[in-house]
Swiss-Prot record:
UniProt organism field: Bos taurus (Bovine)
Protein name in UniProt: Coiled-coil domain-containing protein 102A
Keyword Kinase part of the UniProt annotation: no
Pfam families: Myosin_tail_1
Gene that this polypeptide is encoded by: CCDC102A
Compositional bias ranges of the Pro residues kind: 37-61
InterPro entries per the UniProt record, alphabetical: Myosin_tail (IPR002928)
Ranges of compositional bias, category Basic and acidic residues: 136-159, 166-183
Length: 555
């Protein structure tokens, strides 16, 4: 999902001072006194109980402290800018990843639409297969009828063999009339069933290929939870920031300085750890991009193989149709041969009936035509020979037709065996491809789970950044108050220094006036000297009192 830039980042151009105060752990402005602006005394010494010296304070350490403060502030500003740039880069990366996910989902929706279309085609092919199966069943029934008719012809030939025995008895012509009236039933194309199992198996293969295409994988990534020490450190800093600051001695100031340094080191460690986590996230994203490109290549290869398989299926269908045409032509030839054989059989039947009629007439005239008996026996022998010849010819025709049918059946069985072997090879290859595809789908789901976990971590980091921004804003306010109080103290210090300089000038003026009076009045003696001595003693005591008051105020 895409995320815009954080409003806190856009509204925080003054976070440099706050970040410096947060890292250094500066005290609150209301508790900052004059001792905070002065260099700390060693913790081993004890503060002097007497008044401070009357001379003005040297400004050199304060200037040095201000320069160090500015350099640190610039350093923290640079670090903050780097952190902002990295956060912006992280947000851009997440937006790019969300766009990639949307594109991937669109591709999967297209694949689903193709799969639905393929299923519709498979349904239509199944309907056609059912219709062809019905036609095949009808052809098989017709074939069985043709076989029954051929068996009836065999029975008729058996009756012809027994024709000799029928000469001695009265023939019954009408018994054979129903058999003569039987007409040959035309045989339809029965070879279409030879290739039917092959076509159905190919259709089932295509259906399984389309059904096994998986839906859109959904999941989330699994990665390690980084930055566990950062929340603990931040909570510790918040608790220490909430502690009330009280007026402390110089020793406590030194201990606070060491604590501030420790906190600074801890914050630097946290920043380094967060930086390492961001680098690890960027490496994981690059790795996922590579895997995504590989998946795209594999998907294109699978689509190409699918198109090739469809082409092969169309080629097999065309070959099947050609083979069906050839078999139908063979069946038509066979039907023509059978019709010619039926005509010959009809002629033989007519001749046999004529012979039977002649034999019947001669049987009636046997008593009167004993002389013609031998001739009739010879004719009978000739007829038997003809019947034997006809039987042999019929047997030869049967063997020829049976051998032709056996050859065609063997050829169709061999072709079917080859097609089954090719289908088994294709199924084996399909099983391997299916297994590889399932493995890749599992890897993709794992990668999606890792991406979602990364998104959760990014949300946590953003929440942490917002908390830090709030702390920075509070520290910035405290720093502004501290600067205001420092300016007030500086103004009061300047006023005290001006007062001390004025007092010093007055003291020098009084001393010069006393020296002039001593030089210009040597004649007055001890009285005037005693008088002026008492006044000078009073003035010196007052000056000392004023100096002590000034030093107390400065302290």
């Amino acid at each position: 999902m895409s995320h815009g830039p954080s409003p806190r980042l856009a509204e925080s151009p003054q976070l440099s001072k706050g970040s410096l105060l947060t890292i250094l752990g500066s005290p609150s402005p209301e508790r900052m006194g004059p001792a905070d602006s002065l260099p700390p005394t060693p913790p081993s010494g004890t503060p002097s109980p007497g008044p401070p010296p009357a001379l003005p304070l040297p400004p050199t350490p304060a200037l040095l402290a201000d320069g160090d403060w500015e350099s640190r502030e610039e350093l923290r500003l640079r670090e903050l800018e780097e952190a902002r740039a990295r956060a912006a880069q992280m947000e851009k990366t997440m937006r790019w990843w969300s766009d990639c996910t949307a594109n991937w989902r669109e591709k999967w929706s297209k694949v689903r639409a193709e799969r639905n279309r393929a299923r519709e085609e498979v349904r239509q092919l199944r309907q056609r297969l059912d219709a062809l199966t019905k036609e095949l069943a009808g052809a098989r029934r017709e074939r069985q009828e043709a076989q029954g008719e051929s068996e009836a012809r065999g029975r008729e030939l058996a009756r012809l063999r027994g024709a000799r025995g029928g000469v001695d008895r009265t023939p019954d012509g009408p018994e054979t009339e129903p058999e003569r009236e039987q007409e040959p039933v035309p045989v339809r194309d029965v070879g279409s069933g030879c290739e039917r199992p092959q076509g159905s198996q190919e259709l089932e293969l295509m259906e399984s290929l389309l059904k096994n295409r998986p839906e859109e994988p959904e999941g989330c990534w699994e990665v390690r939870s980084a930055g566990a020490g950062a929340p603990r450190g931040s909570s510790g800093r918040q608790e220490r920031g909430r502690l009330p600051w009280e007026d402390t001695t110089v020793e406590e100031d030194a201990s606070k300085l060491t604590a501030l340094r420790l906190r600074l080191d801890e914050s630097q460690k946290v920043l380094l750890k967060e930086r390492e986590d961001k680098m690890a996230l960027s490496r994981n994203i690059e790795k996922l991009e590579g895997e995504l490109s590989q998946w795209k290549i594999k998907y294109e290869e699978l689509s190409k193989t699918k198109q090739e398989m469809l082409k092969q299926l169309s080629i097999l269908k065309e070959a099947h149709q050609d083979e069906l045409g050839r078999m139908s032509e063979d069946l038509e030839d066979e039907l023509g041969a059978r019709s010619s054989m039926d005509r010959k059989m009809a002629e033989l039947r007519g001749e046999m009936e004529r012979l039977q009629a002649e034999n019947a007439a001669e049987w009636g005239r046997r008593e009167r035509l004993e002389t013609e008996k031998l001739g009739l026996e010879r004719e009978n022998k000739k007829l038997r020979a003809q019947v034997g010849d006809l039987e042999e010819a019929l047997a030869r025709r049967r063997r020829q037709t049976a051998s032709a049918l056996d050859c065609d059946l063997r050829a169709s069985q061999a072709a079917l065996f080859e097609k089954n072997k090719e289908l088994a090879d294709l199924k084996h290859v399909h099983g391997k491809l299916k297994k590889q595809f399932q493995e890749k789908v599992a890897e993709l789901a794992h990668a999606n789970r890792r991406v979602e976990q990364h998104e959760a971590e990014v949300k946590k980091l953003r929440l942490r950044v917002e908390e830090l921004k709030k702390e920075l804003a509070q520290a910035e306010d405290e720093l502004d108050e501290a600067h205001n109080q420092a300016r007030k103290l500086q103004r009061s210090l300047d006023e005290q220094t001006e007062q001390s300089e004025n007092l010093q000038v007055q003291l020098e003026h009084v001393q010069s006036r006393l020296r002039r009076q001593q030089q210009n009045a040597p004649l007055f003696g001890k009285i005037r000297s005693a008088r002026f001595g008492a006044e000078e003693a009073g003035d010196g005591a007052s000056d000392l009192d004023e100096d002590e008051d000034l030093q107390i105020q400065v302290a």
